[in-house]
From Swiss-Prot:
Protein's name according to its UniProt entry: Metallothionein-4
Keywords per UniProt: Copper, Metal-binding, Metal-thiolate cluster
Family: Belongs to the metallothionein superfamily. Type 11 family.
Classification via InterPro entries: Metalthion_11 (IPR000869)
Metal-binding listed as a keyword: yes
Single GO term (MF): copper ion binding
Pfam families for this protein: Metallothio_11
Domain of life of the source: Eukaryota
Keyword Metal-binding (UniProt): yes
Annotated source species: Yarrowia lipolytica (strain CLIB 122 / E 150) (Yeast)
Length: 54
């Protein structure tokens, strides 16, 4: 039973980390110079920025 609880705790921490990482990506790699054109391959293409950098 103890092993099961340890696994559950680890998966909770892991999912929380993924969410944080995704959030940071969106915040840090968007909104570059307006002169640049956004690319389809950009991670944060869903942001409301004129252009995008990653």
């Amino acid at each position: 039973m103890e092993f099961l609880n340890a696994n559950f705790g680890a998966s909770l921490i892991q999912s929380k980390h993924k969410t944080t990482k995704k959030h940071n990506l969106v915040n840090s790699c968007c909104c570059s110079k307006p002169a640049e054109k956004p690319t389809n391959s950009c991670t944060c293409s869903k942001c409301a920025c004129d252009s995008c950098k990653c």
